Amino acid sequence: MSLKFIYGRSGSGKSYYCFQDIKRKIEENSDKKLILLVPEQFSFQSEKNLINYIGERAVSRAEVLSFKRMAYRVFNEVGGVTHRYMNESGKNMLLYSILNELTGELKIFNNAANKNGFVSTLSDIITEFKRYNLTPEMIKEYLEVAEEREDNILKGKLQDIYLIYSKFQDSIRKKFIDEEENLTILADKLKESKYFDGAYIWVDEFFNFTPQEYLVLEELLLKAEKVNITLCTGGLNEGERIDNLDLFLPVKNTEEKILEFVKRNNIKYEKPIKLNCDPCYRFKNSKELSHMEKNLFAFPYKIHEKYTEDICVFQALNEYSEIEYTARDIIKLVRDNGFRYKDIAVITGDLEGYQSLIKAVFTEYGIPYFIDKKVEGDNNPLVIFILSSLEVLNKNWNYESVFRYLKAGLVDIKREEIDIIENYVLANGIRGKRWIEEKDWDYKILYGFNLTEEKEEEEEEKLKKINEIRRKITEPLIEFHNNIKGEITPKKMCLELYNFLEKMNISSKIESWIKYFKERNRLDKINEYKQIWDVAIGLMEQLVEVMKEEKLNSRTLENIFKSGFEQYELGIIPPSLDQVLVSSTKRLRSHEIKALYIVGTNDGVFPSVLDENGILSDLERENLRETGLEVAKDTKSTAFEEQFLMYVTLTTMSDYLRISYPIANEEGKTLRPSIVISRLRKIFPNLCEKSNVIKEEGDIEKISSPKPTFNEFISQLRVKEEGLELSSIWLSVYDWFMNNKEWKEKFINISQGFNHTNYAEIVDTRRVRKLYGSKLNMSVSRLEKFSQCPFAYFIRYGMNAKERKIYKVSTPDIGTLMHDVVESFSRHIEGKNISWEEIDRELCESFVSTMVDEKIKDMKGSILNSSPRYKHMTNRIKDILSKSMEVISQQISRGDFKPSAYELAFGFNGDFPPISIELSSGEKVNLIGRIDRVDKLENEDGTFIRIIDYKSGKQDFNLSDIYYGLQIQLLVYLDALLQEIEDSAKKEVNPAGILYFNMDDPLISTKKEITKEEAEKEILKKLKLKGLVLKDANIIKAMDNLISGYSDIISVRVNKDGSPSKNSSVADLEDFQLLRDYVRKLIVELCEEMLEGNISIKPYKKNNYTPCGFCDYSAICQFDTSIKGSQYRFINDKKDDEVLQCIREEMKED
């Protein structure tokens, strides 16, 4: 029995010394067992290294073991494992069950029990206690003697942990063994084992051990002939006082504990072997790396004056450019310096954040890589399918759970069918019991508030299809849900789940996917999908065994499965031998790395910030240690280990180190470099530093593998297009691509894109007629949309593309409701012979409230009917309408114009025929529309008509907009109405005005207190009619009998003589006629443009406003002013006089 330490700094050859020693023993033909004990993650690589050094004899004579492998070896020899192992998922399920059982008994954790992640946190503390040999009995003893302590929170936590831990142990002992107890059992069983008697053991790659591992080491020291332990340190402590600031503090603490075993058991302590490091064996080819190893964490330190070549720091603009630089440099190393991909490692302290970037960039650059990280099983389609099938029941068929179930990809429903039913469900707000109601869905597909029109045949067919899809979705789920309703045993629950998976043919679908991945050589996916079915079945088996006859419901089952799947990590096999290793700083495997890239070397990432998380705080851990209960280290102690790990990481490679850091993340937030960077700058004043923050790299640096070089080449050609000179090296690149058939074809295709413009070609007239229909019927508002942007009009009305309808209250729907109520109100008082002068606030509120309620009640499928939470919105609508009707009554009462018609329709079934417009070809276009209100005045001067359009949003009147075709609706209606009346009544009728009324219940803000009457007057002003009025003092007076100065009713100010002021929105009869003639001409032009196939992408822009901001089709047109052909139609606001003058000139030309 003897112990010998082999110590030396990182790279000094400690592992190599072990291999040499093992080789010597083999050559001596010793019959003693030769054991190399290493950490679990290093066992495979250590076996490879041992065989590479010693040869095939190593296989038969020496054995590489980890503590885990050692346990299996001993248990096979002397027994010890009589039950099945419980995995992490099983532990989580058992803990979840125990927490439910102890509900009400726990003091601290009662409210935390059902929180996401708490079960895993609880599992971690139990695992920690087991690794540190802390039993429930020891916790109980602590609690018995801790009554005098004042830390009630710690006592409360430990009391809860004791209850959970003891019940956990009682439950697990009956049928299972927790893997965390393996080493404790191993330490005990080693006493019976003969396997290690007289063995020679080398312990390598450890810097510390858990209490369980120390127990095993102590037993090995008692049994083995000799134990050799390597320690990464510059010098041993050997009983001297330990310096708390020593870089090698964690290692020296380990040495101290092992020496305690030696003294306690009277084990022979041989003279340690110190491996010299001048230079360290690993750094024999690099003076720079050797200097860094000695001085990076040394105080005082020595300076290396020469410019560094083996060590370089790269400052990146962001994370993407950082990984792109890394990829280019790796390509350069392999291509120019003779490195193999397997010689290279990329590590980071934030693998979670970097792995997707590394995957994307390395794939683009053609770099083979292996990410040393287990795949989390909870993202697999099978797991999503199982959990969502339960979630659908537990969340009452809500949208998210149903479509997560459908989109897992395991149901026999086509993707198009899922899209069809998803659109329908979103538009109608379908959820809950409506999914499983027996009657067919009959909510309209032609959405809106007007739900009284008969369904068309096409709609009936669509509804039939939707109901067929619904039944395919719901029938298997309803059957499964009925079978697991209520409280049933885990066995019954899992049996029904398994039967459901079989009926849905899930196992064969998984097999099909595996076959699909095999055809594409996706080894990672093959491995994942092969494991996942066994994982799911194993989870069910453990649940049945763990919970036995305990009753549970579907919600509990879902939570247990969630907890179980969260713990599963699927092991992955490296797909090839020659590949770059991508790993985290904590999982870097011990293999010969020549070139190391450390990415994300930012403050808080490398070294990482240690959070004080978990159940026990640092202070509570300290309290436990003071009473003799050893637990895992606190964050302060772990920080020293982090510094040591940083040293180990930075000294892993033998030839080449590249450290990079971004100055900002993807959100633009500034990132600080790690302290490592500043330390490197101190010991290397002439440190190689590069950056792409200011672009300094030459063209040669941009040439790497074909794909990224091709992309860069295309960028260079764009530069040439702009008139800049192209570097000669790109001509050579061009030749290379032209001599490669694959890339030549790609170049020819892409080069055509240089001539790309955003011009939308004119559509053939024949096709236009097919798209818009042979009958030329359209609304005036559609013509206005054509004026805004011909392309948007084409997509909406030609291609019939619509925004996905979502079940919500939209502005157009509210507008329709409000128009319906105003019309009903108007017709109601007309039918009751109530004059507008008689209407008061009380009458408005009463009528409006009743009518809104009736309208909403009749709106089948309306969102305003869906739940009480929309009551506030309904009340707001009522307030707006009540106030609007009150103001309308005042406006009518203040003048001589009286309503003569409401909702006057132009159309085939309307009050008047469609507005017929003859084109230059002789064809006729029929315009349809509706006037909200027509007011009439008859006096000695004749008959005067004004039309009023109600707007639920804000609408201003602008004569410029009429000129540009953006606001022609009212003039078209006025012209048509005057023409119809004149033709039918055979008398002249004059225009009096075209006006908008904005329905609102405005807030009044004042700096002083005002009376109720003053407030009402302010509201009247805010809701005044906006538009164009006849320039006639009598007509103006007839619209506002009380006008004096500014009118409260119309947008007019009168002078003292009664004439309208210069800034009033007025026009004389001649100007009204001019505008009518111009709009007729404009309509002809717009219709002919449309029918000639004009679909140009030319939205208008007025001041800073453009319709693109509210357009549903911007992703289709890809309007961008930097692309040729993408230009706005600029509109300048003109004064009314200028507009009229422009129109006169245009009309003269015609």
Curated annotation (Swiss-Prot):
Residues the record lists as binding [4Fe-4S] cluster: C789, C1108, C1111, C1117
One BP term from GO: double-strand break repair via homologous recombination
Pfam family, one: UvrD_C
UniProt-listed InterPro entries: ADDB_N, DNA_helicase_suAddB, DNA_helicase_UvrD-like_C, P-loop_NTPase, PDDEXK-like_dom_sf, PDDEXK_AddAB-type, Restrct_endonuc-II-like
Statement: the UniProt record of this protein carries the keyword Ligase: no
Entry keywords, A to Z: 4Fe-4S, ATP-binding, DNA damage, DNA repair, DNA-binding, Exonuclease, Helicase, Hydrolase, Iron, Iron-sulfur, Metal-binding, Nuclease, Nucleotide-binding
Record text on cofactor binding: Binds 1 [4Fe-4S] cluster.
Source organism superkingdom: Bacteria
Subunit structure: Heterodimer of AddA and AddB.
Annotated family: Belongs to the helicase family. AddB/RexB type 1 subfamily.
Function statement: The heterodimer acts as both an ATP-dependent DNA helicase and an ATP-dependent, dual-direction single-stranded exonuclease. Recognizes the chi site generating a DNA molecule suitable for the initiation of homologous recombination. The AddB subunit has 5' -> 3' nuclease activity but not helicase activity.
PANTHER family assigned to the protein according to its UniProt record, in alphabetical order: RECBCD ENZYME SUBUNIT RECC (PTHR30591:SF1)
Protein's name in the database: ATP-dependent helicase/deoxyribonuclease subunit B
Organism: Clostridium tetani (strain Massachusetts / E88)
